[in-house]
Amino acid sequence: MGEMEQLRQEAEQLKKQIADARKACADVTLAELVSGLEVVGRVQMRTRRTLRGHLAKIYAMHWATDSKLLVSASQDGKLIVWDSYTTNKVHAIPLRSSWVMTCAYAPSGNFVACGGLDNMCSIYNLKSREGNVKVSRELSAHTGYLSCCRFLDDNNIVTSSGDTTCALWDIETGQQKTVFVGHTGDCMSLAVSPDFNLFISGACDASAKLWDVREGTCRQTFTGHESDINAICFFPNGEAICTGSDDASCRLFDLRADQELICFSHESIICGITSVAFSLSGRLLFAGYDDFNCNVWDSMKSERVGILSGHDNRVSCLGVTADGMAVATGSWDSFLKIWN
């Protein structure tokens, strides 16, 4: 037996010891705890708005904090800011590269960002004096595609990349403040905690990591998925996270218990998950799938309680408004739909 094989076995044994130690701390299962909870019942949501205007696949969307405006990015090379109440386009921003994979709305509403196969994160000022929207910064240091970006405030943004790293940027100087190293596969998705001090990342190494923005360190690593993690989000109280993977499951991990609580899967679901988001209370989990649907799960009982079907292609992105009143889904069919 080679030395590598020996080390591999040793690593597996150590991983098993960690898993056993975690299990020993779990004095009760989530299923036991929530057995007394009332059943959610069928969740039926209708399409209230369809946002038409993109001419190609939509890859990403993100709500503004006002729960009214949202930004979407498409392969047609446009970044569009929409008014979801009227379905009007507030801004249509032509991009230098049409290979866009992510977009983000700043909490202040002053900026939007996007990036993709150009390996850059481009920041656009929506409130410029001239009235036209233009690039205010191009953040380039990643050596792989930009998979996700999220603002912390008007001067700080976190990015994840196909180069396996995440980075915190100072937008004013255009420099990376911190590089977060630890994943062994492409970083696919990130989400920022409600207090903006932590963020989580999901990667193609099938693990999710919790990072401390201020210290620049990895706090926790969560494993259990059998394939790439494509999507990740925080539970509304910031004390748990949910991941969506190509293994056709979503998983809920508790940060304090340091382990997986529940797995959302069904034998009839065999395709990967592209996007995940919680309702305002956290009781419902929305997950977008490659089979053109968005499933609604009871996050406490891991039962499927609804389905949003209306797209003619893969649901690539989704988001719940800050006020919890609506869900938006974006798809490769070039449309965005607003549901409630």
UniProtKB/Swiss-Prot annotation:
The keyword Repeat applies. GO terms for biological process: cell volume homeostasis; G protein-coupled receptor signaling pathway; regulation of blood pressure; regulation of cholesterol metabolic process; regulation of fat cell differentiation; regulation of gene expression; regulation of glucose metabolic process; regulation of hormone metabolic process. SUPFAM superfamilies: WD40 repeat-like (SSF50978). Keywords: Congenital stationary night blindness, Disease variant, Repeat, Transducer, WD repeat. InterPro entries: G-protein_beta_WD-40_rep, Gprotein_B, Guanine_nucleotide-bd_bsu, WD40/YVTN_repeat-like_dom_sf, WD40_repeat_CS, WD40_repeat_dom_sf, WD40_rpt. CDD domains: WD40. Pfam families: WD40_Gbeta (PF25391). It comes from the Eukaryota. The keyword Protein biosynthesis does not apply. GO terms for molecular function: GTPase activity; GTPase binding; signaling receptor complex adaptor activity; spectrin binding. WD repeats lie at residues 53-83, 95-125, 141-170, 182-212, 224-254, 268-298, 310-340. GO terms for cellular component: cell body; cytoplasm; cytosol; dendrite; extracellular exosome; heterotrimeric G-protein complex; plasma membrane. It is linked to Night blindness, congenital stationary, 1H: A form of congenital stationary night blindness, a non-progressive retinal disorder characterized by impaired night vision or in dim light, with good vision only on bright days. CSNB1H patients present with childhood-onset night blindness and middle age-onset photophobia, but have near-normal vision and do not exhibit nystagmus or high myopia. CSNB1H inheritance is autosomal recessive. G proteins are composed of 3 units, alpha, beta and gamma. Interacts with RASD2. Belongs to the WD repeat G protein beta family. Guanine nucleotide-binding proteins (G proteins) are involved as a modulator or transducer in various transmembrane signaling systems. The beta and gamma chains are required for the GTPase activity, for replacement of GDP by GTP, and for G protein-effector interaction. This is Guanine nucleotide-binding protein G(I)/G(S)/G(T) subunit beta-3.
